Each structure stands twice: as C-alpha cells, then as structure tokens.
Amino acid sequence: MKKKAVLAEKPSVARDIARVLGCNQKGNGYLEGNGYIITWALGHLVTHADPEHYGKQYKTWKLEELPMLPKRLELVVIKQTAKQFHAVKHVLNRQDVGEVVIATDAGREGELVARWILEKAHVKKPVKRLWISSVTDKAIKDGFKQLKDGKRYETLYAAAAARAEADWYVGINGTRALTTKHNAQLSCGRVQTPTLAILADREEAIRKFVPKPYHTISVETKDGVTFRWADRRSKEERIFDDKRAKTLQEKLQQSAIVIDSVNAKTKRTPPPPLYDLTELQREANKRFGYSAKETLAALQRLYEQHKAVTYPRTDSRYLSSDLVETLKERLHAVDVQPFRKMVANAKKQGLANAKRQMVNDAKVSDHHALIPTEQPQSASAMSDKEAKLYHLIVRRFLANFFPPSESELTSVEATANGELLRAKGERLVSAGWRGQETGEEDEALARLLPAMSKGDKKAVKWVGMTQGKTSPPPRFNEGTLLAAMEKPAQHMEAKDETIKKTLAQAGGIGTVATRADIIEKLFSSFYIEKKGKDLYITSKGKQLLELVPAELKSPALTAEWEQRLEKIVQGKEQKQMFIAEMKEYAKAVVAQVKADTATFRHDNKTGEKCPECGKFLLEVNGKKGKMRVCQDRECGYRKNIAMTTNARCPKCKKKLELRGEGEGQVFACVCGHREKKAQFEQRRKQNKHKNVSKREVQSYMKKQNKQDQFANSALADQLAKLGLKGDDS
C-alpha cells in the first residue's frame, strides 16, 4: 500500500503531527511510520527569481532598463534552505508515496509555501489538504480523519500566487525606478505606500488645525441635580462666543428651572465580540504597549508551542455553529486559576448566551475567532507576554457566556429663562457579564438622578462656566493605525461612495496576517518614527509620497486589488487577467517616475563619513534608537549610535538610552541622568533585584546590531542588498 507524504510548514508542527500519527523513524529531513512520511519546510523554501535571472542587463540597477516585465516569473530554490528543499523533494517523489497531504498553515500564504514547493519539485501526485484551526492532538487526529481534496484549494493558491507576482511587478519596478532616479534608498508598495499616506494625511490635519476656545455652562439645583446648557436648535453644548457665554451665565442665574420631559429607557450592552487578530493587536498595544509584530509573534508561540489558542491570523470575531459542541471542553480546559471562579459562573449559565453572542456562520470564512483550545494550560510555562495575551483571549471568551448588562438611562430636558438644559443619569439594573472579572474596561456610569416629573420646578444653586479648546485629531499609535488600515474609509475625505464601499467590502488595506509587517517596514525604511507611543512621519516619508504616483497612495486602489484577489479565490476571476493589468500598471508607475521633475533631498546628512565608501552618513531614528546609515544605495553600511534599552533610570525610572561606542558608551535619560556603562554595570551587580545584567546588556546590543532578516521573496532579496524592506503583501 502506498504511503502518504505530509508537508508541514515548520519543524515544530511536523514533530506534533508525527507524534500524533506515530511516526517515530527518523530520516534525513523527515519522520516516518504507520504509512506516513512527515517532512517540513522552513517557511518559504522557494521564491521568485531575482531580476538578473531574466537578463544580465538587470544585474545593475539602471533607470533606462525599466520596466522589467518577464513573460512568466520563474521559481528558484532559496540558497540558505536548499538542503531542506532537496530533502523535501526526495520525500515527495519517493516511489512508495502515492499521495501528498499539505499541512502548512491553513491560509493563503501557507497554501503558497506548499504549492511552490510542489511545483518546483515537479510533484504530480494526488493532493489532500489538512485544514485545521489549532494544532492540539485532538485537532490533528480529527483533521486527518476528514482530509479535504486539494483541488478545493487551487483557487486559493492562484490568489496567493497572483498577490506575489503583483508585488514583484509593481514593487520591484517601482522601487528600482525611485531608487535609481533619486540615488536614495526608496521603496514603494501597494500596501506600504497607502498606509504611509494615511499617516501623512493625519500629520497634515494636525499641522493645519487651529484650536478654537469655547465655554460650557453647568447649572446645579439645590437638590443636587446638574444640568448642562445646550443650544435649542443644534443641541451643541459648546459656546464659541465669549460674550454670549457670559450673557447666558447671568441669564441662567436669575431663573427657575421647569422640567419639560423625563424619558427613561433600558440599555442592553452585550459583552464585546471575540478577538480577531487586529482587535487583539490593538488591545495589546493599548494595554501593554506591544507592537503589532510583538503580539503576532507571541500569539504564534501560543498557537504552535503551547497549543493554547486557535489559529491567530483570523479576521473573524465569531464562531461557526459546528464549534458549539466543543465549548464545554474548552471551558474545562481553562478551569484553572485565575479563571476558576468565572468558569464556575459560566457553567451555571449554560450555552444559551454563548450561542447567541458567539456563533454566526455568515461571519466566518476560512477561520473563526481567536479562542482557547481544549488543551489545559499552565501560565507558568508561558512568558509574561504570552500569559497576558492568553488571559485577554480567555477572559473575552468567558465573558460571552454571560448575558448582556442592563442599565436604565434617564434623560431630562428642562427650560430656564427660555434656555434648554439637559441632564442624564444611568442606573445599573443587571450587571450581566460586567459582574464578572472579565478584565474589560467598564464604561463609567453617570450619576443617578432623583425622581422627577414633567412640570416640576427646581431652584438654581449655582451656575458654573468651564473654558476649553477644540483639540486636533490625535496622532496615530500602532493600535489606531491598525484600525485605520482595517477601515481606511473613515480616514478619507473622498466623497465617492463607490470607493468607500470598495474599501469596506475588501476589509481595508493589507490583511490581518500582513499589517504588522507593513508597519515594521515603514519603521525599517525610516519613513516613520515613534515618540513615546505616537507615530510621526519622517522627512524621508513625506518626500517619498511626493515622488510616487498619486494612484499608488490611494487606499482605494489596493483595496480594489484585494477584492479582485478574493474573486480569484472564489473562482470569479482569472489570475492571468489580473496579472496582465498589474504589468500595465507597473509600466505606468515607471513612466511617471521617469517623467517626474521632483527631486529628493537628504536633510539628515551628518559630518561623519562612511568607513566603507567615504560618503557622508545619514542620521535616522530607528524603532529602537538612533542609527547612522550610508546614503549610497549600493553600500548599505549602518551602525547604531543610540538605542533605547530595558534598563531603568535610578532617578525617574524611565528607560535609559545607550549612546556612543566602545569604552565611551554612556547610559542617558531624558531627565538628565547620565552614567558610564562601566558604572551602570557596577550598580547592577550591587543591586540584584534589578532586571538587567551585563550579559543582558551585551545580548541586547548584539540583537540591535543584527539586521532584520527579510521575507523569502525576490523583492525582499533585492531590497536586502540595499538595507531596505519590501512590501510583500
């Protein structure tokens, strides 16, 4: 009987599958037993060929050689992981293998990882698909009992390949055109560039904002009710005319208050929906300051290593109905401290609330919301970051077993000397889910109002006036930028409802799986920088937006592309038609860059020369500190000159910055505290209760000096040679 070759995305997942299936015999890059051979990729083992593969003229970056539009993009084996590719190829093509099971991540990119390997290895055997939302033993066993036909996912592969090819044609051509035209390390991409444009638009709105002073008026009665004045026609509470505000204050002081209406209604507030990836990234950024990338990395460990949560790269906040039968088992798995009391209360509620609030088949596509698995966990085995995220997921899950909270809202309108006064009160009737230790932030309940009826009269105790100023739009942080990428129409001035509809249907720009990487690329390309939690666009970022074609800056364009990729998944559009249009668009981008008369100017040039090529270095703010990088795109030299560490200032407890090189390195704080590195290390030895040791400082420095590894794509490989990051999604 022929054996089944199973292709996993990573060694850790392959080991889990092998253990569950009883594959104990070790081979070269595989595990075998019970009729299965489990092998694994290391992420992408195959990628698109570099431009020079299609002609020697493309080896050197020259504007006149653009655009590069190979008729067909060819696949090549990635050199660094070629050994594993050949091991996988050998397994897949063994004569005793009759069927291949794709067990890579259940999503578009996971499909691409596997299918590119199968294509490059010339595998022509029948394909089955393991499609599971968690990697617990139970999920793996159940998944292998109901393997899907691989043909069912061929359109998913077509969409993934179309996305990668579009990024090659548009990204590489646009990046080479900008870089060679302006002799600067510039890159553009169909997701990266519109995301940068969203930040730039907010920056411009803040710059143009002119604050306006205003007053609000409060009136307190002798029985303790506080009313607020409002314009009778517009209902606006702010008064922008100083003279009018003073006149109103005097007018209200000389009047009695007559109640015009008292309205009471019940407000039902359900628990917040379960987490999808974006919502969890936003919450983790807001609560703990984690970057989107940090959250995704910790989630991936919770999913793969701990088997604690379901598939993380999901865009759904609901469960499918077939998961209802697993809810009791999941409750049992989280019946440990600190959730035990909440679990006991949840069990008393039964499943009625959970079904009503969590289950919605229409809002689940490939993957359901993030929830705990059926496998019991120990928080002690998790890192601090992992435990915090796990707690958020579990508490949100448990909250949905409880009914909505109920409160009574009372709104009162009154007249005083012809002016409208309003008061609001809120009384909690039933706590529902709010009565549990969910960890959610409760809305502050308004003060209670005494009983009142229409026609009641009240005496004025005092009339107060408060002054304020209108505020500019807030700066983006990583959490709010993720939200803007998900719903960019809310941040556009465009009145075209068709564009807004397209953005809504496409689910924004980028995907839940790629948005964190896009933000990281904006940092590593020095287009944005962080001050505190706020994001600022750099001079380089602003100039880039002046140099790229206007259409590439529009969120609508990339959203339209995402829609078309989804149509390819659904079988409603052909990949070839989409790619033909991407080639034409790449041509147009190059033509516009060539014709543009604008210039790029380095305004961060230092007096220090590059030790490798002699040109002056540029000073930039990286995500974790200041760096100096060579302005020459072919040199790529860079060094850290100041980096934010985890060490704390002994005076104000803020994070210290490590500056300088060699023996002259100094720790400095914004409060003015400074100490040499040697003194810092000596102080650490004397105080063992602190967290940073000499070894940790040195380890941290080494990590900071390592350049980030680029994604396995031809575009990324090209940009890596320049010290740039590509937009591969």
UniProtKB/Swiss-Prot annotation:
What are its cofactors? Mg(2+)
Write down the InterPro entries for this protein, in alphabetical order.
Topo_IA, Topo_IA_2, Topo_IA_AS, Topo_IA_cen, Topo_IA_cen_sub1, Topo_IA_cen_sub2, Topo_IA_cen_sub3, Topo_IA_core_domain
Which domain of life does the UniProt lineage start with? Bacteria
> Can you quote a single GO CC term?
cytoplasmic replication fork
Give the residue spans that cross the bilayer: none
Region named Interaction with DNA: 187-192
Record field: catalytic activity: ATP-independent breakage of single-stranded DNA, followed by passage and rejoining
Q: Which residues form the active site?
A: 311
- Quote the Pfam families the UniProt record gives: Topoisom_bac (PF01131), Toprim (PF01751)
Provide the alphabetized UniProt keywords: DNA-binding, Isomerase, Magnesium, Metal-binding, Topoisomerase
Region Disordered, as annotated, extends over 680-708
Domain Topo IA-type catalytic: from-to ranges: 153-590
Under PROSITE patterns, the record lists: TOPO_IA_1, TOPO_IA_2, TOPRIM
**Binding positions for Mg(2+)?**
9, 105
Which HAMAP family did the record assign?
Topoisom_3_prok
Q: Which family does it belong to?
A: Belongs to the type IA topoisomerase family.
Q: What does this protein do?
A: Releases the supercoiling and torsional tension of DNA, which is introduced during the DNA replication and transcription, by transiently cleaving and rejoining one strand of the DNA duplex. Introduces a single-strand break via transesterification at a target site in duplex DNA. The scissile phosphodiester is attacked by the catalytic tyrosine of the enzyme, resulting in the formation of a DNA-(5'-phosphotyrosyl)-enzyme intermediate and the expulsion of a 3'-OH DNA strand. The free DNA strand then undergoes passage around the unbroken strand, thus removing DNA supercoils.
Q: What is this protein called?
A: DNA topoisomerase 3
Query: Which organism is this protein's natural source?
Result: Shouchella clausii (strain KSM-K16) (Alkalihalobacillus clausii)
